[in-house]
Each structure stands twice: as C-alpha cells, then as structure tokens.
C-alpha cells in the first residue's frame, strides 16, 4: 500500500495532481480542500494517500492530513458511497464539519454535498455515528497559493463538485473580495448549504 508521498508537485488539474517522487510520477485525486492548499507547481509537497485497487484500475487519492484520510476511509465503508463520492463530500466540507454534521444528525447539511441524497445522508448518520471525531482544524501542511482570478477559480471548483453554473455564481456573490481561493470555496459552499 502507498501510505504517503513526498516529492515535487509537477501537475495540478483539479481534482488531479501529479507528484514526482525520485523520477516516478504518481497521479492522485485530491479533495478541493486539499487542492487549494497545495503549493505552486515545482515545489515540494507531502500527501497522505489511500490506494484503491479495482479490477480495471489502481486509484490513488491524496489528502493534506492524516485526519482527512481517516475520514475518507470511514466514508467509503458506508453503503452507497464510493471513492469519488467520498472525495466530493470532503471537497464540500472539512473532516471536522462532516464529523459535526454526523454528530448533530444534520441530514440537510449532509445531503447538500454533491451526490448525496436524503437516504444516503441518513445512512451516513447511522453508520458513522461515533466513528468520526471533530478536532480543531489547523492550516494543514501547505501554504495557500493565491490565484490570479479567485472568483473564476471558486466557480470552477463548484462546477467540478457538481453544482450548476447558476448556483455557483450565486454562491460566489456572498464571498468577500480578496478572499483566497481555498477559503472562498469554503464560504461559497456554506452559502449553498443555507
């Protein structure tokens, strides 16, 4: 199993990245929370990873923190939630926010994540209750990288998460100007969940 990668970030195409580790390029899918906290291409990066082996593919998923990876592992154990859906959930909310939503049995909040309906949200509450613990969130392993046009990047991220253009643009209107992309995505997602 590949548990962690440390190397040079060589590609960033949401939600995929490529990390060069001693001449071998590892492609990994990452949550948008992790993606917008990555350093610029060409800089050193460390990711916690989860390798999923299927009959037709080997899929590598990357996470900024061990806690995010642990949450991903719990999510994919829930019936009806696959790896891509779990990554979408972790893009829509942090591991802490997810843990709080499960603890508070906030089905509405959970079902607002892309690909999650009311029944799946109820199943998440049932199967994850007591398994996720909210922690104080730190800034993670990376410094945020400023984007040239934050609003456009935030809208693009929301579109990648499955929201339509109208919803994405409406959510971005509530984000203060000058907000970095990672924080902007979090604020826009909160606007969508209201």
From Swiss-Prot:
Function noted in UniProt: The RuvA-RuvB-RuvC complex processes Holliday junction (HJ) DNA during genetic recombination and DNA repair, while the RuvA-RuvB complex plays an important role in the rescue of blocked DNA replication forks via replication fork reversal (RFR). RuvA specifically binds to HJ cruciform DNA, conferring on it an open structure. The RuvB hexamer acts as an ATP-dependent pump, pulling dsDNA into and through the RuvAB complex. HJ branch migration allows RuvC to scan DNA until it finds its consensus sequence, where it cleaves and resolves the cruciform DNA.
Quaternary organization: Homotetramer. Forms an RuvA(8)-RuvB(12)-Holliday junction (HJ) complex. HJ DNA is sandwiched between 2 RuvA tetramers; dsDNA enters through RuvA and exits via RuvB. An RuvB hexamer assembles on each DNA strand where it exits the tetramer. Each RuvB hexamer is contacted by two RuvA subunits (via domain III) on 2 adjacent RuvB subunits; this complex drives branch migration. In the full resolvosome a probable DNA-RuvA(4)-RuvB(12)-RuvC(2) complex forms which resolves the HJ.
Region (Domain III): 147-194
Domain notes: Has three domains with a flexible linker between the domains II and III and assumes an 'L' shape. Domain III is highly mobile and contacts RuvB.
Name recorded for this polypeptide: Holliday junction branch migration complex subunit RuvA
Cytoplasm listed as a keyword: yes
UniProt-annotated stretches for the region Domain I: 1-64
A family per Pfam: HHH_5
Main location: cytoplasm
UniProt-annotated location(s): Cytoplasm
Annotated stretches, region: Flexible linker: 144-147
Family per record: Belongs to the RuvA family.
Biological-process GO terms, alphabetical: DNA recombination; DNA repair
MF annotations from Gene Ontology: ATP binding; four-way junction DNA binding; four-way junction helicase activity
Organism: Neisseria gonorrhoeae (strain ATCC 700825 / FA 1090)
